[in-house]
């Protein structure tokens, strides 16, 4: 799990700006208990499968966040999840290509102006600001 500064979510994209100014892009996926178990395991947590099923997916996500000490998001692995300001649980899988490729794709899809000379950090900050 990495420390993040900002997260922007729009359409199928989740864009994360980390404390060290690195940027990562995830693509939304269906939230499942299996994905949450995988994320929990990647962060050294183990939960019994039945406990998660009995209490529901939202409870399970919140339990993982509370245990790891972040009230809103787990980012930095192959998968991520985030609870937005409307209390909606959003799950994503790391974009398969490069970060810059993902940022270009987002910029083109949402008609965001950018410069080819920007580094990933500059580009990522611009995308996050535009998606908010």
Language model regions located:
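Extreme N-terminal leader/activation tails
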Residues: 2-12, 35, 40-41
């Amino acid at each position: 799990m990495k420390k993040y500064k900002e997260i922007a979510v729009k359409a199928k994209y989740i864009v994360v700006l980390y404390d060290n100014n690195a940027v990562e892009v995830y693509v939304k996926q269906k939230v499942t208990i299996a994905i949450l178990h995988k994320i929990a395991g990647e962060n050294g947590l183990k939960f019994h499968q039945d406990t998660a099923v009995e209490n529901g997916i939202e409870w399970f996500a919140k339990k993982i966040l509370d245990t790891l000490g972040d009230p809103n998001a787990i980012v930095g692995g192959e998968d991520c999840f985030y609870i937005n300001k409307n209390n909606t649980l959003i799950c994503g899988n790391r974009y398969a290509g490069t970060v810059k490729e993902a940022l270009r794709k987002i910029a083109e899809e949402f008609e965001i102006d950018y410069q080819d000379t920007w580094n990933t950090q500059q580009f990522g900050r611009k995308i996050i600001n535009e998606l908010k």
